[in-house]
């Protein structure tokens, strides 16, 4: 049902922009990679709690780049909320982070968190089982990152990776590092945080609308959004779309796509011929529990673990309220921040007033405040290659060469 709804949204969007018949509408991430003449490889890894995650790899690019030690540096890219590995390759090769890093000589790995298009398997559970969806970004931070990064290091023989995360891909890394004893941090040479997430108290859009529409004690979230895989009921979508998009000059069908309702539908830096491809591959799925966790964060104003309710919290956490992730405890990994006032999700004032006040200045290598980036522009925007990807490539290259 969810994929059918996304297909309809993509069909209407492509009618608007006049881009009929793009083969990438029906391709997987590896197929998109191969379409542009790059090698693509697929790997799977099991998490400690049984989920089977699929990763996509571009082992090398079209250029003949050699390294002194004979090993290519590894960059691991982690998608954001409701997204997938495709985010890093859905623009043209000279516009997509995955291809640009590959052509610069990097071994590129693209992760997929549990519950998205590519990570829908479990050792014992099926997606039709409600227990399959009993998780939020807590478990992604605890299990998924560990499993994927460790597998990448095992396959490549490297002892560390360069990490580029977007949106939820930054939240999970921040959260994992905040509980790390130092053993994981040493595996992350540099952390490029695109649209970084700490507090989301002041966000706009879909999540803010529903979080503020109902009280924190409201217990009908799963009735509204459906149990298991996240799919808002039609009335809920229409209610949110009317409130959020009523005053914006956007195509109705584009606004009906829940991803744009969450992240912000207006952008002046998308390749418009690619919009149907964006809308076909995203949203890529997550659990309703994960969406509820995000809305709990809106109410909380910080970064709490999932709130199961007082009784279960006491069993799970040993206290009535969920504990908060302590970002002041992060150490050992250099972080490069990229954020914008125009972002609905990694917004102002949450980034400067919450995230930056908690990260130790000693680990914040760069704080890049970019003008006019919405939440999705960090992966799809046409200015991102010059503003983010190429500078990041140079930083990683110089670091790997010991400059």
Swiss-Prot record:
Disruption phenotype: RNAi-mediated knockdown impairs triglyceride catabolism and further increases lifespan extension in response to bacteria (nutrient) deprivation.
Pfam family, one: Abhydro_lipase
Signal peptide boundaries: 1-18
Induction entry: Up-regulated by fasting.
Molecular function terms, GO-annotated: hydrolase activity, acting on ester bonds
Active site: 167, 343, 375
Assigned GO CC terms: extracellular region; lysosomal lumen; lysosome
Residues glycosylated per entry: 64, 271
Similarity comment: family membership: Belongs to the AB hydrolase superfamily. Lipase family.
The protein's role, per its UniProt record: Lipase involved in lipid homeostasis. Does not affect global triglyceride levels in response to nutrient availability. However, in coelomocytes, specifically promotes triglyceride catabolism and lifespan extension in response to nutrient deprivation.
Name of protein: Lipase lipl-5
Gene, per the UniProt record: lipl-5
């Amino acid at each position: 049902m969810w994929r059918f709804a996304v297909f309809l949204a993509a069909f209407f969007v492509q009618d608007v922009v006049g881009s009929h018949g793009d083969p990438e509408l029906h391709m997987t991430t590896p197929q998109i990679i191969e379409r542009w003449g790059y090698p693509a490889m697929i790997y799977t890894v099991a998490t400690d709690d049984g989920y089977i995650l699929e990763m996509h790899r571009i082992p090398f690019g079209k250029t003949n780049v050699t390294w002194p030690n004979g090993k290519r540096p590894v960059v691991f890219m982690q998608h954001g909320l409701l997204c997938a590995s495709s985010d890093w390759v859905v623009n043209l090769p000279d516009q997509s982070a995955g291809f640009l890093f590959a052509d610069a000589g990097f071994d590129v790995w693209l992760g997929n968190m549990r519950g998205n298009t590519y990570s829908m398997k479990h050792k014992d559970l099926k997606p039709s089982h409600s227990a399959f969806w009993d998780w939020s970004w807590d478990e992604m931070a605890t299990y998924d990152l560990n499993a994927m990064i460790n597998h990448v290091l095992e396959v490549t023989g490297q002892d560390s990776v360069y990490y580029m995360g977007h949106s939820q891909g930054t939240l999970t890394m921040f959260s994992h590092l905040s509980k790390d004893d130092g053993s994981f941090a040493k595996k992350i040479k540099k952390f490029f945080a695109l649209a970084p997430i700490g507090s989301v108290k002041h966000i706009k859009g879909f999540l803010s609308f529903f979080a503020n529409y109902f009280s924190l004690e409201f217990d009908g979230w799963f009735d509204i959004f459906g149990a298991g895989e996240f799919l808002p009921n039609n009335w809920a979508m229409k209610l949110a779309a009317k409130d959020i998009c009523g005053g914006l000059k956007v195509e109705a069908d584009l606004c009906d796509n829940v991803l744009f309702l969450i992240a912000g539908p207006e952008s002046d830096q998308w390749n418009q011929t690619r919009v149907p491809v964006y809308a076909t591959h995203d949203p890529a799925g997550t659990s309703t529990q994960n969406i509820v966790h995000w809305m709990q964060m809106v109410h909380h104003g910080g970064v709490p673990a999932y709130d199961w309710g007082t009784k279960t919290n006491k069993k799970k956490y040993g206290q009535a309220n969920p504990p908060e992730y302590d970002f002041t405890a992060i150490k050992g990994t250099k972080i490069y921040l990229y954020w914008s006032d125009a972002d609905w999700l990694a917004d102002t004032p949450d980034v400067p007033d919450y995230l930056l006040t908690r990260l130790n200045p000693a680990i914040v290598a760069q704080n890049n405040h970019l003008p006019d980036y919405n939440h999705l522009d960090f992966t799809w925007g046409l200015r991102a290659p010059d503003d983010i990807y190429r500078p990041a490539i140079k930083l990683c290259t110089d670091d790997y060469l010991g400059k």
